[in-house]
Amino acid sequence: MPTWHYSYKLRDESRIAKAVQFDIPVSIKDMREAVAAIRGKKVSEAKKLLENVIALREPIPFKRYKGKLSHKRGLPAKWKWPIGRYPVKAAKYLLRLLEHVEANADNKGLDKDKLVIVHIAAHKGMTLKRWMPRAFGRATPKFRRTSHVEIVVKEVD
């Protein structure tokens, strides 16, 4: 079994809560952009943003994986970037992960209203290789990509 550790160096464990989720069935490209949008925000603000993404009210800017994507209304005013999407599936899993880290912080006795995301990262997970039969005895690959996400929140004054 391979070993795993957080890519964030923990300093003061008493004021920090962390959570991780493995093998999320979301493309790493979508997950990376959603993670970048909530990095550095308060947990309550991040949850509100993700709920708006799920309801298709607010898009997330796509800065790296932006090929052939359209401009979305309201993005330049808030993010100074016109290109974006609504990664609903990634937002659902991130919202669940935020609830987990909030519960971990509550178990440590931290105040849920003062939590700030100090570290969040998405890593490439396992790729499930499947094949779809085609005509004349051929087959087409269908790859299911997964992601791993880790999050660390800190209580600020």
Swiss-Prot record:
Family matches, as CDD domains: Ribosomal_L22
GO molecular function, one term: rRNA binding
Pfam families attached to this UniProt entry: Ribosomal_L22
Key words of the record: Ribonucleoprotein, Ribosomal protein, RNA-binding, rRNA-binding
One of the protein's GO biological processes: cytoplasmic translation
UniProt GO cellular component terms: cytosolic large ribosomal subunit
Signal peptide: none
InterPro entries: Ribosomal_uL22, Ribosomal_uL22_CS, Ribosomal_uL22_euk/arc, Ribosomal_uL22_sf
Complex formation: Part of the 50S ribosomal subunit.
Function, in words: This protein binds specifically to 23S rRNA. It makes multiple contacts with different domains of the 23S rRNA in the assembled 50S subunit and ribosome.
Family: Belongs to the universal ribosomal protein uL22 family.
Protein name, entry field: Large ribosomal subunit protein uL22
Source organism (scientific name): Staphylothermus marinus (strain ATCC 43588 / DSM 3639 / JCM 9404 / F1)
